[in-house]
Amino acid sequence: MASCSQHLLSAVAIFSVLAGVATATSIYTCYEGMGLPVNPLQGCRFYVASQTCGAVPLLPIEVMKDWCCRELAGISSNCRCEGLRVFIDRAFPPSQSQGAPPQLPPLATECPAEVKRDFARTLALPGQCNLPAIHGGAYCVFP
């Protein structure tokens, strides 16, 4: 009888360890379609362009900001920085200002991509969406 209890206890312990590893792995899995929506934060494109480069807003600024912040809030705090990075790289590629074809149609093409990229990096900060990231703060560090 003790042998059966030991086996059961061992099985529970192994299951707990495996569940912990699976959870830890999935928390930090931030890819499009897994932890991130496909093509994340598209509602932020027009907001960023209107705030940085004088692009004519399609909607009132408050509406665009709210839409952008809701999209960002919908991404787990563990994946927010990666979501911002994917969004920035796709919506405002650095090559856009260097003549290479952008992945998305450019907004406010007369405005350097770096200006839009720098502003987009601040979207989680208190002055914008005020959302925590994985570090417990809102600041995301990426190239």
From Swiss-Prot:
Its main location: secreted. Endosperm. It comes from the Eukaryota. The keyword rRNA-binding does not apply. GO terms for molecular function: serine-type endopeptidase inhibitor activity. Belongs to the protease inhibitor I6 (cereal trypsin/alpha-amylase inhibitor) family. This is Trypsin inhibitor CMc. It comes from Hordeum vulgare. The lineage of its organism: Eukaryota, Viridiplantae, Streptophyta, Embryophyta, Tracheophyta. The gene is ITR2.
